[in-house]
From Swiss-Prot:
Function, as annotated: Suppressor of RNA-mediated gene silencing, also known as post-transcriptional gene silencing (PTGS), a mechanism of plant viral defense that limits the accumulation of viral RNAs.
Protein name (Swiss-Prot/TrEMBL): Suppressor of RNA-mediated gene silencing
Family membership noted in the UniProt record: Belongs to the phytoreovirus non-structural protein 10 family.
UniProt KW keywords: Host-virus interaction, Inhibition of host innate immune response by virus, Suppressor of RNA silencing, Viral immunoevasion
Gene Ontology biological process terms from the UniProt entry: symbiont-mediated suppression of host innate immune response
The organism of origin for this protein: Wound tumor virus (WTV)
């Protein structure tokens, strides 16, 4: 599928600059104002900046090394702003794992998972190759009037794929010629969609930190159903909450229907959620492309289901989570069959 780079750029500018712009400016200001050496490191401005970075570090949105005053920094770039997809953190990495060599203080800025759709698209610079995703970030920061580098800090993008022989990609100051369109595969669209749902469940509900009663990661797989349509989701919620109110709990804030009873491997699902990123996809794709994507993840299709993992905090190791889509076509088929309510598919 060919998608317009201008549409993708404008969409991510809306998300990063307009929705999250205040936080981005705050994090850049803290990195700029943090002084590491001399009397200036003890000024009220620097101490306040250090306090802010420590708070972000507690929320897994930053990193600051201990005993900063005892270090010899020389000519090292010792501070950094790192843009990273949330899936990197929910996949088990800690902020410290993302820090470039020599950096002792950093803040993380989470980017939409849809930005990773551009990771495979290589932009050739004079002596380097960078993913289009990092170039797009540079352009957005420039439009936000933010310098990507300073005398003692740099900006980076953590690229999840290993195509560039490194994951930490330094944001370039100059902007190369941008392509007018990019080709996106349905498989990548499905992968990113699952990443978004996975992030929702982990960051919004924290549900994988406490295992359901009777669930063992060694032998069981959590099952999550997700849908692109609010109408389908609301119908399911009404049905299960009215028919079996003691088995489920619904979070209107996070759009998640959770099973509360003892875990059984025969249950068709453990959680049912609305994928909120569908509106983002509809901005990137044409109507025909969006329909093709829904067809590809429909009933009986190879992209119907996907397995993700979450690092368990217990001795059992990783938790395996199976995600499966419920599309408008599935709902229509249910109506044709004469069903008065949607039925959970067998998994």
């Amino acid at each position: 599928m060919d998608a317009s780079v201008d549409r993708i750029t404008n969409l991510h500018f809306e998300i990063l600059a307009k929705a999250g712009g205040h936080e981005i400016h705050q994090k850049y200001e803290a990195i700029r104002k943090l002084n590491l050496t001399g009397d200036s490191s003890k000024s009220n401005i620097s101490v306040s900046a250090r306090s802010a970075i420590l708070k972000w570090a507690d929320a897994k949105q930053g990193y600051i090394a201990s005993q900063l005053d005892d270090r010899d920094y020389g000519d090292l770039i010792a501070k950094a702003v790192i843009f990273v997809p949330m899936s990197v953190i929910t996949g088990g990495k800690n902020p410290k794992d993302l820090i470039p060599y020599g950096v002792v203080a950093a803040v993380l800025i989470f980017v939409p998972e849809t930005l990773t759709l551009l990771d495979e698209i290589v932009i050739n610079l004079m002596h380097d190759k960078k993913p289009l995703s990092s170039i797009l970030l540079t352009k957005i920061l420039r439009d936000m009037k933010i310098d990507v580098c300073g005398s003692n800090f740099d900006s980076f993008y953590y690229c999840p794929i290993s195509r560039y022989n490194r994951h930490i990609i330094k944001l370039a100051g100059a902007l190369p010629q941008m392509p007018t369109s990019v080709r996106l595969s349905v498989n990548d669209l499905a992968r990113v969609a699952i990443s978004e749902v996975h992030n929702q469940l982990i960051s919004d509900k924290q549900m994988f930190f406490k295992l359901p009663t009777g669930f063992s990661p060694k032998v069981h797989c959590l099952k999550v159903l997700c849908t692109t349509e609010m109408e389908i989701f609301q119908k399911w919620v009404r049905t299960f909450m009215s028919d079996r109110p003691n088995e489920f709990i619904y979070s209107d804030q996070f759009n998640i229907l959770s099973r509360t009873t003892y875990f059984s491997s025969d249950d068709p699902f453990s959680f049912f959620t609305l994928w909120r990123g569908w509106s983002t996809y509809k901005e990137i794709l044409s109507q025909d492309q969006a329909s093709s994507f829904l067809e590809a993840i429909g009933s009986g299709k190879p992209l119907r289901s996907s397995i993700a993992t979450f690092p368990s905090m217990f001795d059992e190791g990783a938790i395996y989570i199976r995600y499966e889509w419920i599309t408008p076509k599935d709902s229509a088929n249910s109506k044709k069959a004469g069903s008065s309510a949607p039925s959970a598919p067998k998994m």
